[in-house]
Amino acid sequence: MESLREIIDRVLPLLSYDPQAPMLFSSELFLFLFAAFAFFYGFMRRTPALRIWYVIAFSLYFYYKSSGIYLLLLVGVSVSDFWIGRAIAHVGSRRAQRALVALSIAADLAVLGYFKYTNFFIEIARDLFGAGFLEFQNIFLPVGISFFLFQSLSYTIDIYRGSLKPVDRWGDYLFYLSFFPQLVAGPIVRARDFLVQIRQNPIAVSREMFGTGIYLITIGLFKKAVISDYISLNFVDRIFDDPALYSGMECLAAVYGYALQIYCDFSGYSDMAIGLALLLGFRFPKNFDAPYHSATITEFWRRWHISLSMWLRDYLYISLGGNRKGRLRTYFNLLVTMVLGGLWHGSNIRFLVWGVMHGVGLAVVHAFHELKKRFWPDGFTPSPALHWCGVGAAWLLTFHFVSFLWVFFRAEDMERSLEILRRVFVFGQPGEGFPLLVIPAVLIGLALQLFGARLFAAFVDAQERLPWAVQAVVLALVGGFILKMGPDGVMPFIYFQF
């Protein structure tokens, strides 16, 4: 028998926050806790009030394990925007509504600005006025702050625009903002799509939802633990840490490797988030749709991080005027939107470069389509051979444009970003050798891009024929096998830092 002290020692880590070990979907601890949580959740199908607060409690616990005391910030934002949303709906004056939505935007952006950009502006001030002008601040960045603040902003803005009615209960709004599957890295869920699902009675999980959820959790775990983490630890990290040690071909392979790593990491998280939500009876929007199939930058942003792309379009690009104010203004709006999208990821010159280049890419594609309309107003129908050659060339150009810009996203500083690009385009430098064991992981990742939809359909079809209990056992066995296949230890998801 364990002594009381031994039991306490085993339980304490579950109740304490460790900044070096945030709770991750891909950890054995989370999967075990979720299984226990889901078991009791099943008994609350017909009790909405109890179910809502049960989920809120687990969500806040999950966030506490990720960001500690900053769960109070999450709760504070929910209180603030809940009451501002209700005030916007009930005041009669449009001027008062405008002031209230401005207050919400200013408060949320001030919170985001403090945590993400304080040291960025201090660095600028030190460059202008000298190193002794200001000291850098040791500011902890709460996990997922950009995601839940964007969700909260969309809520008050939609009420102001008249496209959404405010919720009557604060608990419902806290549920929406804190729901653990999407809390720390999206998808960015719109209030109008999610709030109507909260008080389902009874909560409905169809066989199709259950099978799809299990597939998405399994494939997301595989993408993260087996492909992304393996490529990162065994190849990509080594080259990006010190590119001067590697040849141009090895640096090019690392560029391709990181393009695959970030896709498998982020889409793997999104798959798991959507799958977990489905098992609980909630539907999230798709967040990735084979983005590396894209033949233009515009198409890429319709397929990559779809919830963020749609948010930037609806609340920033359209608010700036969209394409309604002339060609030059359209290009300007695209550039501003992508620059701010880049800075949303982080306060660093690398993200600024990344955003500027994507904005330029979108503007160039838009200008190309305008020219095509001018020269071929009735349309242009090339021969099949010419069509496929053009599509292939466009895909190749788009893929490399996106992949090389990921270098700025991944490298620790501009110096290493430029060193990798220099070595890629100046061949002949000696290197340490390409690790052949990485190749299978790369090939599997590419296969998921090409055949993911077919695999999904086949898996769900097979799963739906099995009893629910068998499906749960399959998930547990496959999940355990995947975790054993992956590297030792669990690496944080890349988008946790945003």
Predicted regions and their residues:
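Membrane-embedded transmembrane alpha-helical bundles that form the catalytic cores
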Residues: 2-446, 452-497
